[in-house]
């Protein structure tokens, strides 16, 4: 009989990612591909959706972790959810408002009377939109806001909207790869708030 100890049973961990499969989650993909999580005894299950939904699921321990914006944690705590922000994922707030370069939208004030696409009125995208508008003394009533789901790159490329709110590593990169230059308005240039991070619950930690 072998004297080697039996390998410990893997622990199942659910991680909610508030988007669709994307380059921004590359560290998790690499970790799974190279077996880093498996070597640590973790069976990692990734799921994609909306971060406001995952916040509730993490709060009741249906999911153990999520990647979400700091503001969502504050809102969750205010609602009594036992969620905790434990790891900074970005050093800068990752969301921008981007547009085709020929639209000449380079600063918040130039969004007035423009059609702006956004996944919905929630999460990091909505926080960035509100912050950027406020920097110019604008409100949502000063723009035409359209909920377009996660179709930002296509919506901007096809001129369905003048600009869209997206992660800097997503929509603007997709257009750049297609040869379409863009302008980007970054929230961090006007307001510094906690960026997205790894969120868990008090039971897990």
Where in the sequence are the language-model features?
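Short loop->beta-strand "edge-of-pocket" segments that line small-molecule binding or catalytic clefts
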Residues: 11-19, 109-122
């Amino acid at each position: 009989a072998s004297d080697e100890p039996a390998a410990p049973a893997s622990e199942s961990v659910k991680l909610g990612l508030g988007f669709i499969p994307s380059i921004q989650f590359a560290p998790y993909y690499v970790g799974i591909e190279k077996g880093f999580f498996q070597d640590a005894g973790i069976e990692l299950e990734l799921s994609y959706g909306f971060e406001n939904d995952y916040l509730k699921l993490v709060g009741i321990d249906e999911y153990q972790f999520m990647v979400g914006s700091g503001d969502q944690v504050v809102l969750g705590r205010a609602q009594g959810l036992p969620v905790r922000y434990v790891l900074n994922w970005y050093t800068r707030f990752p969301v921008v408002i981007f547009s085709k370069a020929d639209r000449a939208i380079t600063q918040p004030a130039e969004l007035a009377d423009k059609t702006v696409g956004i996944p919905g009125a929630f999460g990091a995208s909505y926080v960035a939109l509100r912050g950027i508008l406020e920097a110019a003394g604008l409100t949502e009533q000063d723009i035409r806001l359209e909920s377009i789901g996660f179709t930002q790159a296509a919506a901007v490329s096809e001129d369905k909207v003048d600009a869209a709110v997206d992660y800097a590593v997503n929509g603007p990169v997709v257009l750049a790869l297609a040869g379409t230059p863009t302008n980007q308005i970054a929230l961090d240039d006007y307001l510094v708030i906690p960026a997205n991070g790894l969120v868990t619950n008090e039971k897990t930690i």
